[in-house]
Amino acid sequence: MDWEGVTFGAFLGVAGTFGMLALAFYPVMRRTFLLWNAVRTFAFCLMGLALFPVELPAFFPTGEARIDIGEIALSIAVGCTGPFLAAYIEERAPYARIRFWLRTMLPIGVLGGVATALAPWWPRLDWLHDLIILAMILGLLVALIVA
C-alpha cells in the first residue's frame, strides 16, 4: 500500500458517498440538484478510475481507449455542473439568463465527449475537446461571479 493508492481510495470513497447520499435523499427532498450531483460524482469516479494508473478488471479498456473514457467522463462531469448550479439559482427574472446558460452546459459537455470519441480519426478534435472544457470552466466562473 502506498500513498497514491490511499489518496485514490479516499477520493473514490468520498465521491461515491456523495453520489449515493444524493440518490438516497432524492425521494425525500425531490430536488433536481441531487440528481445532477449524483451524475456528476459518478462521472468523476469514472474519470478517476480511467485516468489513475491502477490495475482494473479485464473487461475495462486499456491504452488510448482508457484515456478517452476518462476524458469523456470529464466532459460529462463538467457539463453536469451547469444544470447542477442552475438548480440552486433562484427563478427570479434577473437570473433567468444565467440559469439558461448554465443549463446549456450539458449539451456542450456532451459535444466535448463526442469530440473526444471521434479524435482517433480526426486528431484536431482533441483540441476542440480542450477548448470546450476551458469554455465551460470560464462560463461557470462568470455565472458564479454574476449570480
List the predicted regions and their residue ranges:
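Hydrophobic core of alpha-helical transmembrane segments in multi-pass integral membrane proteins
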Residues: 107-118, 137-144
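Individual alpha-helical transmembrane segments in multi-pass integral membrane proteins
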Residues: 1-113, 123-134
